[in-house]
Structures are given as structure tokens and as C-alpha cells.
Amino acid sequence: MAANAPIEKIRNIGISAHIDSGKTTLSERILFYTGRIHEIHEVRGKDGVGAIMDNMDLEREKGITIQSAATFAMWGEYNINLIDTPGHVDFTIEVERSLRVLDGAILVLCSVAGVQSQSITVDRQMKRYRVPRIAFVNKMDRSGANYDRVAAQLKEKLNHHPVQMQMPIGAEDRLKGLINLIEMKAYYFDGESGEDIREEEIPAELLEEAKTRRQQMIEGVAEVDDQLGELFLADQPISNEALIAAVRRATIGLKMTPVMCGSAYKNKGVQLLLNAVCAFLPNPKEATNEALDQKNNEAKVILDSDPEKPFVGLAFKLEDGRYGQLTYMRIYQGRVTKGDFIINQSNQKKVKVPRIVRMHSSQMNDINEATAGDIVALFGIECASGDTFTDGVVNYTMTSMHVPDAVISLAVAPKDRSNLTNFSKALNRFTKEDPTFRVHRDEESGQTIIRGMGELHLEIYIERMKREYNCEVQAGKPQVAYRETISQKGEFAYTHKKQTGGSGQFARVCGYIEPLPSDAVQQYEFVDDIVGGSIPREFIPACDKGFTEAVKKGSLIGFPVVGVRVVINDGAFHAVDSSEMAFKTAAIMGFREGYAAAKPIILEPMMKVEVQAPEDFQGSVVGQLNQRRGTILSTETAEGYVTAVAEVPLNTMFGYSTDLRSATQGKGEYTMEFSRYTPVPRNESEALMAAYKEKLAAEQAARK
């Protein structure tokens, strides 16, 4: 284990991909070649061990990566912090969190399936955080592998400027090695696990094609790099050093994506990919990181990866380890030493750093100090995910991470009442770890409701309660997060009057509600059009409070009302009897009056569903989606597989994975992510309203 490398030699990289693109296998090979592990394990724990990066039992069993493990590795003189991120859409917050702390990333694509829906989602997240990336076309040994087609899809589907840096020698099961188009050398991977690299001249029969491809590569880089472009246009000779420097500049500037290829499973191309990570991806000094200065009205500040500047670190992930809470932290500026006192900017609490470790999945190595650019884990620090720590000299917070809304909820309770303490502990820990996992108690029913990003997301947490807290859980039927809105303008003029001896209550509010434009960012807007003081200024905020309260629960089925603008333009008050309370009540009742007149409708979440199955099953795949009120957006067939993309109501998607498995003999796969809200068909709407009325009547009867 080397000491801290100079910052120029540090790379903080993530591996992001569509589920089953071979991402965890690639991470495992990287750890093997960098000497962090001494044998290779396969992903699904068939050999009783499972991949090192998948360190929760559940992950090894399901063969999907859930928590992004942070691992430290060394390649030559470079220190590489590797973050393995989940590829399943239900775990998007983990991907977002790790991208927040990375300087660069490897986008893994399957050579057969190419750019899939989850690749698009992950890429969108990378764009949001301006993460430079290298594309790695994996599984080149598979039947139907097509390096050129995947590179073309990067341009068509993701709007990248892809430049192929390599050329495969052979394809599918005849994949022998790779040609590096910069060095113009052929590389072969010998030894039991591809650890012995043999460099040779390019085979004569491939030389012409390699020369053509090298020229295309130079043209591709010259298009986006001015310095290389000038040499190219002037017909000057271009050295390998000039070419590497140009690729690096263009990649870090997000102007191009170098495209590499290989097969992690067959141990081909991983070492060349590591060389490319060091050559083309930025060091922490070259990445731009912003913070908000709390002393200066949240003005943006650019952080400097200088170990001598005041300390700023971001807690981006929490885990409960054997020795207490483990806090993963990215150091953006300054340094932190064992025994230091640091300040949590979210609550101004001062905490001591008892222990700093470098993580290797769930194993750890103690270190005394971490400096700018490092990713480490601290013990004994109480905080929430996303908290910023400083040494107190500066009052900076890192920009808050984008947290998507939950789309599905579930009522849960422990099967055994004596397990209530563990049940509460588990929920408390999970909400701290994962901002997209939300818990609330339904006041009316007294039930505990958990909300998340999809069925699998919630299932995993229920399973974790059982495993980690010995708490079996009863779960209700999943509930869809419906919304209500209005379809036209509705007026209101409501007077709230109460006289019960002593001072009474009086308030009158008049105005209208109308739909907001469909592209509006906020879901509720309050407009004060009062002139002439018909409602005194001090009562206007109370009106806003009342309307805000009213939109929390619509009258059709009791779900939040979205997409409304409330305008008040008249009213009346009483010198003695008017109060904030009276105006708040009048606003609530006024909203209900206007809402009833504005033709309210129910909205349901629509999901973008992408299904992949052998093309023999195309009819049944499309048929199933149609049965579930789905709208087919596209179908593509390639290499014997059909990919169908559809928009389907979430309400009809429960149990879909079982149906798809049986319809495709277990060969079909699907991913699903939230797309938008749309009006519910009339018959569905009537059924939902009838069920809501019944529920209210039952609750009323129970209270009597």
C-alpha cells in the first residue's frame, strides 16, 4: 500500500452501466490486475464467494450491485479510487451520489445490446454532474458483438462525439487481442487470467484497416481539439504524445468520448482500459467543484484541490459497519488528520475524527491522514448522507444532490410486535442512508408507509430488515402515487364566519384557480392580486399557508393537487374578528370551492418500460404491454433479440416481472423508470373515486 500519491496521480472514477453489462465483473478484473485481490470470483456467488465489490449477501445472491462500494487500488504510480455503482434503475440515488464525488467515469456498454435505456439514464446523470467519461464496449467475445455499431449508437442515442481508440483482433469467440491505434501495436493477453501482456506488431492482414482507422481517429479528435486541428489541417506530422494530449484535453472538456473495447469475462483489454483511465481522465485538480458560501448568501465558490487550503469534505454515503457508522467522504480541499475536530455544516456540530480508513469493498486499511482529492471512510461521525464538513475556517456547503421523487408506496408492519424496536431502528438507518427511501406515518390509519423508486427498491429494504435486523415484515399491496389537478379555471368567493361569544372569526377571500402551463417547474403558484387593502398585508401569508395546506390533499381521492395557480383578487376583513387563523381557514375552504368548479381530474404516473427478449417472443411481449394499457414507442430487432420501449401506467405494472418470465421462458428482461404524469381513463377514475368514498365511509363508521 503506497502512501498518498501526488494529486496529479490520483484518479477518482466510477463504473456506470446498464444492468448486466458486466460492470461488476470489470471491477473485479481491475482489482485483480492492480494486485488488490489474488484470485477472480464470478459475480453470482456460485463458487460460494461472489464478487468482492458486491459485499452485501443480498447483492451476491441477486447478482446485482446495490450499494456502491468504494475501493482503493494502484496502477503503476497512480492511485485509483474506484466506485462501483448499481445499474438497476431502482437504485438511481446511489448512482447520483457516486457521480457527485467522481472526477471521471467508465461507461460500460454491452457489445451486443449496445446503448440501453439504463445507459441513457446513467448518461443523463453524468451530464448533470459534468463527468468526463471513457466508453468501454464489453463482452466482445459474445455472439453478435459489434464494436462499430455500439460506437455509432453513442452518437445517435446519447449525442456523444465517440472516437474509437482501438480495434479488435477477431470477434465473438475468435477474439484474440486488441490493436492500440495510437501506438499502432497489437496486444495479446496470456497467462491463466490474462495477466501477461504481449506486445507485437500488427498482423499483416489487419494493417491496412488499422491505418484507415487510425486516420479516422485523428480526424475525430481534430474536429474537437483546436491544437490538433491546426496540425492536421497544416498536414504536419502528429506525434503520439501530441495525440494523447489532445484526447486528454477533449475528454476532460467533455467534447469527446474515447471508445475502448474488450471482454472483462475473458480477461481481454482491462489493463489497456486502466492505462486509458490514467491517460485521459482528469485528476482532482482538473475537475471543477463548486460549493456554496453560507456566510455570503450561498454565493458559488470554486474549490481548489490544495491540501494547504481550509478543509472541505462531503459525506456521500453511510453504512453501518461492525464498528459503528462508516461515513464515506470525498475530500475536496485541505486535509483531515486522525484526531482532528471537524464541523458538520448542516447542524454546526463539532465532531472528532477517531479513525480514517481506505476502503477495499468491506475490508479496510487504516491511514493517518487524507488530503484533497482522496476518497476515504471515517468512523464515529454522526451525520446524514449529503452533509458537508469543514474545519470551521470556511462556512461552505457542497451543492445539494438532486433527489428524485418517490413513485410507489407500501404499508409495512413487523410480523411480531416484539420486533418494533428493530423495525424502527432499521427504518431510521435506511432513511439516513438513502434520501429516496422515505417513511411516514399515516395519521388516519396509523400505518407506517414506506415510499421509494420502484417495487425492487422497496423489496430490497424489506429483505434487508429481515437479514440485518432479524425483523420479518408484513407488507400491504403497493400503492401508486397518484396526483390530482384541474382542467379549467374555477372561481371562489368564500366567507368564513364564526361567532361563539367573545371575539369571533371573520375572513373573506375571493379569486380563482387555474391550471399552470404543462412545462411549469413548480407545482403550485400563489398570486396576490389584492388592491385597495380589501385584505390587509399581514394576512396575505396566512392565505398562502391555507392554499398550500389545501393542495396537500385533493377531494377526488385524497392525493396531492399539482399544476395549479391560485390567484386572490378580493376579500374582506373585520377589525376585531379577523385573524391569521380565520384567513387560513377561509383560504382552505375557498380553494375547495374553486377546485370543485375547475373540473378536477386524477393523474397517474406513467413509466418508461424497456423490455428485451429473444425475437420469437415479440408477439407476447408487445401483447402483454398492450394489455397493461401500454403505448408502444418503438421496437427494434438486432442479433436475434427484440427491444420494445413503451409507456405504461405504473398501476398496471405490479407483478409484471413474473408474467414476463413465464411469457419468455425466463429469457426476457426489463427496466422501468418514471416518465410523466397523465390523466387516468374515465372508468379507472370512477373506480378510484368509489374506492376512496368507501374508505372514508369505513373510517367514519369506525370513529362512531
Curated annotation (Swiss-Prot):
One of its GO terms (cellular component) is cytoplasm. PROSITE patterns: G_TR_1 (PS00301), G_TR_2 (PS51722). One of its GO terms (molecular function) is GTPase activity. Keywords: Cytoplasm, Elongation factor, GTP-binding, Nucleotide-binding, Protein biosynthesis. The keyword Protein biosynthesis applies. Its main location: cytoplasm. It comes from the Bacteria. It is found in: Cytoplasm. The keyword Cell division does not apply. Residues 8-285 form the tr-type G domain. Pfam families: EFG_C, EFG_III, EFG_IV, GTP_EFTU, GTP_EFTU_D2. GTP binds at residues 17-24, 84-88, 138-141. Signal peptide: none annotated. Belongs to the TRAFAC class translation factor GTPase superfamily. Classic translation factor GTPase family. EF-G/EF-2 subfamily. Catalyzes the GTP-dependent ribosomal translocation step during translation elongation. During this step, the ribosome changes from the pre-translocational (PRE) to the post-translocational (POST) state as the newly formed A-site-bound peptidyl-tRNA and P-site-bound deacylated tRNA move to the P and E sites, respectively. Catalyzes the coordinated movement of the two tRNA molecules, the mRNA and conformational changes in the ribosome. HAMAP family: EF_G_EF_2_B. This is Elongation factor G 1.
